Regions:
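Short inter-helical turns and helix N-cap capping residues of alpha-solenoid HEAT/ARM repeat scaffolds
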Residues: 15-16, 46-47, 76-77, 107-108, ...
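Terminal, low-structured helical/coil segments at or just beyond the last alpha-helical repeat
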Residues: 161-180
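HEAT/HEAT-like alpha-solenoid repeats
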Residues: 6-13, 37-44, 67-74, 98-105, ...
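Structural detector for internal amphipathic alpha-helices that build alpha-solenoid repeat scaffolds
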Residues: 1, 10-11, 17-32, 41, ...
């Protein structure tokens, strides 16, 4: 039985979290652009369970929703930009790489961190310059994402980059430095 689009949109906009979760779980095969955009907008929901459900259904959706995800990378919402880059990576969707690269200088450190992680996961060798620059970001999580992305790409660090990571005095960097 097909659920009418209006009912889906009403339930997604509902303040009742149980109704939202119930509706979201039924949308893994949906390809309606309007519904997918509405689902993506829920990355700004206060409830982490809703955001997690959104992430899951978009990753599991086997339809070609690349264009919608790529368009969402220009959203005003840092959550939408960040999570859509990760979803493209989880879907192994290389179509979004050039669009994701543009977000390496995003105003949000959370978005930059996710973007660098996505580029590493996608093995985006054409983003090496941007990933290397991430080592010198002001945010420690962005540095970690950049370092991890470089390790996934089998890239070596310059002496200057090694010094920058060693300065962080963080066990995560020690592990990553051993890989690089």
């Amino acid at each position: 039985m097909t659920i009418p689009k209006e009912l889906i949109l009403n339930l997604l906009d509902s303040s009742n979290k149980n109704k939202q979760k119930s509706m979201l779980s039924q949308l893994t095969h949906n390809k309606d652009k309007g519904i997918i955009k509405n689902v993506i907008s829920l990355f700004d929901d206060d409830d982490i369970k809703i955001r997690g459900e959104v992430f899951s259904i978009l990753c599991l959706n086997e339809n070609d929703i690349s264009e919608i995800l790529i368009d969402s990378l220009t959203s005003k919402s840092k959550n939408i930009r960040a999570f859509c880059s990760l979803i493209l990576a989880n879907r192994n969707d290389a179509n979004g790489i050039n669009h994701i690269i543009k977000l390496t200088n995003d105003s949000s450190s959370m978005a930059r961190s996710c973007v660098l992680g996505a580029l590493g996961y996608l093995r985006a060798s054409n983003a090496m310059k941007e990933i290397h620059q991430g080592i010198f970001d002001s945010d420690v999580e962005v540095k970690k994402s950049a370092a991890h992305a470089l390790s996934l790409l089998g890239e070596k660090l310059s002496d200057k980059e090694k010094i920058e990571l060693e300065k962080q005095n963080d066990p995560d960097f020690e592990k990553i430095l051993k890989k690089l």
